[in-house]
Swiss-Prot record:
Tagged with keyword Manganese: yes
Domain of life: Bacteria
Chain's role: Catalyzes the NADPH-dependent rearrangement and reduction of 1-deoxy-D-xylulose-5-phosphate (DXP) to 2-C-methyl-D-erythritol 4-phosphate (MEP).
This protein's record includes keyword Glycoprotein: no
Name of the protein in question: 1-deoxy-D-xylulose 5-phosphate reductoisomerase
Single GO molecular function: 1-deoxy-D-xylulose-5-phosphate reductoisomerase activity
Residues noted as binding 1-deoxy-D-xylulose 5-phosphate in the record, renumbered to the chain: 127, 153-154, 190, 213, 226, 231-232, 235
Residues the entry annotates as binding NADPH: 10-13, 36-38, 126, 128, 219
Annotated residues for binding of Mn(2+): 152, 154, 235
Keywords: Isoprene biosynthesis, Manganese, Metal-binding, NADP, Oxidoreductase
Cofactor: Mg(2+); Mn(2+)
Pfam families assigned to the protein according to its UniProt record, in alphabetical order: DXP_redisom_C, DXP_reductoisom, DXPR_C
Family assignment from sequence similarity: Belongs to the DXR family.
Amino acid sequence: MKYITVLGSTGSIGTQTLEIVRELPNKFKVVALSAGRNIDLLTEQVSQHKPEVIAIDDENLLTDLKNNINNLGISNPPIVLGGREAINSVAAWDSADTVITGIVGCAGLIPTMSAIKASKNIALANKETLIAAGSVVIPALKENKSRLLPADSEHSAIFQCIQGLPNYENADFVTGQIPNGLKAIHLTASGGAFRDWAVEDLKNVTVEDATSHPNWSMGRKITVDSATLMNKGLEVIEAHYLFGTPYQNIEIVIHPQSIIHSMIEMEDSSVLAQLGWPDMKLPILYAMSWPERFRTNWKRFNLTEIGQLTFKKPDEVKYPCMGLAYSAGKCSGTMPAVLNAANEMAVDQFLKEKISFQEIPTFINKTCEAHINKLNLNPNLEDILEVDNWARIFVQEEIKKGKKYINVE
């Protein structure tokens, strides 16, 4: 039995994690949950899973949440906490051995660090933690003897493929050390909502268009990131930190079927790939169950049903966010945190219909350019949080100016 904490339990990753727990009740027990604002769903989750402690990020909802829990009438009700510090306490909850981090965006960084400092195993679905603060997170993992297991499909695929390399049992998969025999990583991308659109048609994109993914069921923010290909660009930075691979050896390839979740190329030129249906529960389960494989009743893989697998090179003009991510990763230091924060704010403003879809990379690029002269190559956690806040404010101020900028390559 594994005892788990789910951070962001009412979001897409959190709800899918709890579906897995319901399907495998003899393998997992939920001991702690955290959510942002959805107290009704959190109350329902408490009724089903009966955790020891829960936390809501919005302290203004704490009284209502406590009333909801009292009205459940369950024996041994959970401790109910509120606020950011409460989320951190839940992340480090003593009886949990594995923490699933499903909080969207950089908001998941501090809770993840709390879990690492408590020496928990981390099932990381919050890629922003490594993107913004990989240079801080990786040493913290080593220092606290905490293991980080990727819970997103691409990095889970790489993680699984690496176990086919020589001496894999001795490889430090997730602390930035290049596994023996690994030459390159090929990250697959669906191409997002606009993979079949002409570049000139992107000026007409609506929020509804951008939040409809052809293959995956995901939250709104990450679905927009998929449409801009920023999601894949961020995953390049994440792969660099997880597996120690140089940026020039990490390639993005469009794979519309989303069946091959990523590939690794070895020093002898052979390639290993991990295949499966496009279902986020697969990588989440593996991060939770590793090093074991638990039997499920999920749909079995069928190559003849798929019919064909196709690949193509991504269009750099169509997907400028991809190049911005590579550039920020190569700059290192605080630049990835600035990129991530600017993207989060730009996407938020797009979802609120304050800017157009094509302005997302424009404002990200402007923010990164403004940070070049302030780049810190050896940041601590406080430095990262400071530039994260700066970048968000900068994007908002630039949008308020109402100016249009041309992306500078």
